[in-house]
């Protein structure tokens, strides 16, 4: 589109970018080298956001429907830093089952390439989770100053004013944070071709393929996997897969509750997990 870029770029970019796709090594290397927002979470939609901005003219606008995890997840700080330098116009946090075959929370993001001023206000709306929608009508948006998110911890995009006030209060009164007494890690990601029905070396360990529920666990150990650099993502040390810890599902259940349970078994897991280390006695 040489004519378009001669005029500075597109007026608008819209789409539903892919997410959750497994990347080959050469694809991952390409994205890391060409996109500043990509991080330890190799979600392709991150690159689509950056690409949309690069395709726009300075006054242009883009809108995507994408997962909502980037608004607060620890692996998306680069993306939040990037998007907060652009003028965010609207964020709509959508209800369950927008995509019937995908169990994932999504939102609609509308933003422009323009640089926001100190007084710029973002319109946000959080749908009740069980609402059924077929179109987006007039909504009672909340107004949040975009620079408010520059002052939240890790620049999290909190979409409700009452939640912002609550977090501000908790910060001021000095409540202890859970991160002061525990460490949280993400499990492993790898090509399932690395699984083996038997251990081939002493670096192979049982791979958890069961289910994590609220306070209970269904352990299914069929395969083994080697804890090595062959894994696409892993903690640096194997100790995180041993001893007392809490396994956490990445997605909350439909009642907006964390799904987590205790285990002390040695096994390699994919879910998030946390280990508590504190001078205060903690019984798991």
Q: What name fits each language-model region?
A:
Residues 3-196, 268-272, 281:
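Signature of N6-adenine DNA methyltransferases within the class I
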Residues 21, 46, 53-56, 163-284:
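Polybasic, glycine- and aromatic-enriched phosphate-binding surface used to engage nucleic acids
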